[in-house]
Regions:
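Glycine-rich phosphate-binding loop used to anchor ATP phosphates in small-molecule kinases
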Residues: 48-98
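Conserved glycine(s) of the Walker
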Residues: 12
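The conserved Walker
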Residues: 8-9
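Conserved beta-strand scaffold positions in the cores of enzyme catalytic domains, especially
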Residues: 26-28, 91-95, 149-151
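Hydrophobic anchor at the beta1->P-loop junction of P-loop NTPases
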Residues: 5
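NTP-dependent small-molecule kinase module
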Residues: 136-162
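A glycine- and Lys/Arg-enriched "phosphate-lid" helix/loop adjacent to the NTP-binding pocket
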Residues: 91-137, 141
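Conserved substrate/cofactor phosphate-moiety recognition/catalytic segment
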Residues: 15-64
């Protein structure tokens, strides 16, 4: 089984994947690690090509009967169109989405928890307005494409059973 965990920046994708790794011993790939590897190796033009590479990695995991989680911001909302039925039967997708109300009332906590798993070098670009815009857009895209999502509106209690 492959689990795709999507969502805007700061929604807790990596933290969720880390918790699921610890609970189920299922490995995960952070798309940010792949992206940073490309950037640091001077291959910045390749960052736009992440989804085709990830898609083929997912197919390989399914073909080999391996469990894998892939988390990050670069999973397209029309991801299903990249796979035939025999693959889709083994892939789950969830997008983490924070409501405007949650962001408004918990922005300080969101910023505080930004480094729970990964150490961000510069988080100054994270603004309340940006988070609201990104999460609102993601919710609209999830609804338009019929994607499963977890709406974070009250207490932050994101969990998935594999």
């Amino acid at each position: 089984m492959v689990l795709l965990i999507a969502g805007a920046s700061h929604t807790g994708k990596t933290l969720l994947a880390q918790r699921l790794l610890e609970r189920y011993r299922c490995p995960y790939l952070s798309i940010d690690h792949l992206k940073m590897g490309l950037i640091r190796s001077g291959r910045t033009a390749l960052t736009a090509e992440l989804w085709p590479i990830l898609r083929e990695m997912v197919k390989t995991a399914v073909e080999n009967g391996q469990n894998l989680m892939v988390e990050g911001c670069y999973i397209p909302f029309d991801w299903k169109s990249s796979f035939e039925a025999q693959y889709l039967a083994h892939i789950r997708y969830v997008c983490l989405i924070m409501t405007e109300r949650y962001i408004e009332s918990h922005f300080g906590e969101i910023k505080t928890h930004a480094d729970d798993v990964e150490h961000r070098l510069d988080d100054s670009g994270c603004t309340k307005e940006g988070l609201i815009a990104d999460n609102t857009a993601n919710l609209a895209q999830c609804r338009a494409h019929g994607c499963d999502y977890i709406l974070i509106d009250g207490d932050y209690a994101v969990d998935i059973t594999l």
